[in-house]
Amino acid sequence: MRGARPDEFNFSTNPSTPNTGQPTPTYPAGVGGGGGGRKKGVGVRTWLVLNSSGQSEPKEEGKHSIMRRTGLPARDLRILDPLLSYPSTVLGRERAIVINLEHIKAIITAQEVLLLNSKDPSVSPFIDELQRRILCHHHATKPQEEQNSGGEPHTRVDPAQGEAGTEQSSGDQGSEAKKDAKQSLENQDGSKVLPFEFVALEACLEAASSSLEHEALRLELEAHPALDKLTSKISTLNLERVRQIKSRLVAITGRVQKVRDELEHLLDDDEDMAEMYLTEKLAQKLEDSSNSSMNESDTFEVDLPQGDEDDRLPPEFASEANRDGRYLQANDAHELLMSTQSALSRNSRGTHTSSTRSAMTNKLDVEELEMLLEAYFVQIDGILNKLSTLREYVDDTEDYINIMLDDKQNHLLQMGVMLTTATLVMSAFIAVAGVFGMNITIELFTDNKHGPSRFIWTVIGGSIGSICLYVGAIGWCKYKRLLE
């Protein structure tokens, strides 16, 4: 047999020792290799954890720890990364809901809420409001939980009822977890209480919509005076203010539009809304686990030996079995087969009933979530309509300013035409003076008696002729509607 090469079993952790063909072992921060002076691991951030009773606790968790805790993939956690620019997103997963709305970056599970940027000053009011809502939800569901868990008598089986009573008690215990989960969602007065994840989701949606609405209102209050001032006086300062307002308007309109599109996408897809029922899915898992344990117990009862089967018989049948043991042995195979068939049929009926009830409940729950999302969809749509109205007002102001500038430009062009016409007439008069200024001998220059008077009449006649030419040119332009 060929021997192994020396470097195949080289597992040395010394960095100076080469280890070809094997991956270099890596150590976390502070473990080995002088890691005591290194920073904490990459991806470790401070999360504020709010449990179902309203208590908050900051924890430093890494990416992999959050993935194990919430069951989310790495790409979903990347959405919450503050260093990356992701649009507003609401994702429903198997065990958690990912919320990335404006300044709110959170992960909602069936029992807790994890906030990423809890130290942000803009998030502090949201944390207080979320704690208040969670406390109200906890106080609303706590009496029912105490009533369901405390002082409830256990179901006793009458020995005279035999196996039927045992099967009935097992079936009741199979759906006990789901009944408790359903009863915990009802208030003392019988009114419906939203699940924990919907309470947190509603708080996130309300905080995001309120933030957008306040920003839109503040922008509207700043925009109207600036636009009115620009209308009355066009200046560089007013134009700069309107330009900044328009840039902010475009930015906030895009953000509101993204939130609206996200809510509309959720409302159009019932499967995505069904994924957000974390409490329902958790109760369903508990029911499935109880059903599986019940199935195992039924299978175990079917496979019991002959002595145990005799012990499980009711009293009136036990006496008959003692009197006629041979009859019981002859029908042992038949009874075993019938008990197996009854167990299988009972399990199939329970599974069918559970699935039917779950489907009907999911339909009602999706309708309930749809009503919740529609309320905030209408609010976001109203904010978008306000921004659209403000955008139209800005566009109308721009059109009005352009009309004013065009009117001023037309006046400047008319003035240019009038000045050009006057210059042309003056050029004609100067041409007459130039003709008389030529150095030639004529009779007018040699007449000493009538020379000055003729000069005066020539100047007066040239001026009157120039004025007549100017008036005629302006009249022709107005006739052709070149001038107003």
UniProtKB/Swiss-Prot annotation:
<comment type="similarity">
    <text>Belongs to the CorA metal ion transporter (MIT) (TC 1.A.35.5) family.</text>
</comment>
<keyword id="KW-0460">Magnesium</keyword>
<keyword id="KW-1133">Transmembrane helix</keyword>
<keyword id="KW-0812">Transmembrane</keyword>
<keyword id="KW-0175">Coiled coil</keyword>
<feature type="short sequence motif" description="Required for magnesium transport activity">
    <location>
        <begin position="437"/>
        <end position="439"/>
    </location>
</feature>
<dbReference type="Pfam" id="PF22099">
    <property type="entry name" value="MRS2-like"/>
</dbReference>
<dbReference type="GO" id="GO:0016020">
    <property type="term" value="C:membrane"/>
</dbReference>
<keyword id="KW-0813">Transport</keyword>
<feature type="region of interest" description="Disordered">
    <location>
        <begin position="1"/>
        <end position="40"/>
    </location>
</feature>
<feature type="coiled-coil region">
    <location>
        <begin position="203"/>
        <end position="275"/>
    </location>
</feature>
<keyword id="KW-0406">Ion transport</keyword>
<feature type="compositionally biased region" description="Polar residues">
    <location>
        <begin position="10"/>
        <end position="24"/>
    </location>
</feature>
<feature type="region of interest" description="Disordered">
    <location>
        <begin position="141"/>
        <end position="186"/>
    </location>
</feature>
<feature type="region of interest" description="Disordered">
    <location>
        <begin position="286"/>
        <end position="320"/>
    </location>
</feature>
<feature type="transmembrane region" description="Helical">
    <location>
        <begin position="416"/>
        <end position="436"/>
    </location>
</feature>
<feature type="transmembrane region" description="Helical">
    <location>
        <begin position="455"/>
        <end position="475"/>
    </location>
</feature>
<protein>
    <recommendedName>
        <fullName>Magnesium transporter MRS2-3</fullName>
    </recommendedName>
</protein>
<comment type="function">
    <text>Magnesium transporter that may mediate the influx of magnesium.</text>
</comment>
<keyword id="KW-0472">Membrane</keyword>
<dbReference type="GO" id="GO:0015095">
    <property type="term" value="F:magnesium ion transmembrane transporter activity"/>
</dbReference>
<dbReference type="InterPro" id="IPR039204">
    <property type="entry name" value="MRS2-like"/>
</dbReference>
<feature type="compositionally biased region" description="Acidic residues">
    <location>
        <begin position="298"/>
        <end position="311"/>
    </location>
</feature>
